[in-house]
């Protein structure tokens, strides 16, 4: 699995990115916080080094990369090495499942979403943060991904594609917010705002419930 290998080999480089892009990172956290509940049992699938789970109060995480999980564990998270399509979790365990820039690295997104629904409690929330392929930054990432350490094997999707997969998995109505407008080299203060719905923001957050 080349994607896992990249993150395994460059876990520190990945983690350092957040310190070097603090304003972008905080805008993404703010967008996710719009939908992440303050209470309940949550898990982040593709938790990486824990950069999103920790500020959002998510206690558990899974990831296929052992080295990424080592960093997440040092941040106080309870973690397990696994992939999202085959979660080592009983049915209906969580009030929240969180994914952040994960679906672009998943081989079978529909299978992933069905598995996430399985582990969610009735009325539990699924919150997905992803790069909108149709945004300015998304198009830039797509055109330059062959030269990217992390995005070389990524597949970016439109909001409509992700929404269709979520609906097909059996989830309920969808809500959205977005941030990171413009780019790709820098973002103004206005470009880092969090807005309801979706249009041309690069980072889109989708929220739905397990009905």
Predicted features, each with a name:
Residues 98:
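A conserved beta-strand element that flanks and buttresses the S-adenosyl-L-methionine
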Residues 154-170, 174-176:
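Short alpha-helix
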Residues 202-211:
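C-terminal lobe and adjacent flexible extensions of AdoMet/dcAdoMet transferase-like proteins
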Residues 1-38, 51-52, 125-153, 180, 187-189, ...:
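Conserved class I S-adenosyl-L-methionine
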Residues 101-104:
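Short catalytic micro-motifs in class I SAM-dependent methyltransferases
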Residues 43-86:
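Class I SAM-dependent methyltransferase SAM/SAH-binding core
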Residues 110-122:
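A short glycine-rich, Lys/Arg-flanked "PGG" loop and its adjoining helix->strand segment in the class I
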């Amino acid at each position: 699995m080349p994607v896992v290998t990249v993150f395994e080999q460059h876990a520190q480089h990945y983690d350092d990115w957040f310190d070097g892009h603090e304003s972008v990172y905080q805008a993404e956290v703010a967008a996710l916080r719009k939908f992440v509940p303050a209470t309940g049992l949550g898990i982040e699938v593709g938790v990486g080094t824990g950069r999103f789970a920790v500020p959002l109060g998510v206690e558990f995480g899974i990831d296929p990369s052992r080295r990424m999980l080592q960093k997440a564990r040092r941040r106080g998270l309870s973690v397990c090495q696994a992939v999202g399509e085959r979660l080592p979790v009983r049915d209906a365990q969580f009030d929240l499942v969180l994914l952040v820039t994960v679906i672009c690295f998943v081989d079978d997104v529909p299978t992933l979403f069905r598995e996430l629904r399985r582990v969610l409690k009735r009325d539990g929330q699924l919150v997905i943060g992803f790069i909108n392929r149709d945004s300015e930054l998304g198009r830039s990432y797509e055109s330059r991904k062959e030269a990217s350490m992390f995005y070389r094997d990524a597949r970016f999707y439109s909001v409509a594609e992700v929404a269709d997969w979520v609906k097909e998995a059996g989830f309920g109505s969808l809500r959205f917010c977005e941030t990171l407008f413009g780019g790709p080299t820098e973002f103004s203060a206005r470009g880092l705002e969090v807005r309801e719905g979706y249009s041309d923001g690069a980072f889109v957050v989708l929220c739905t419930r397990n009905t």
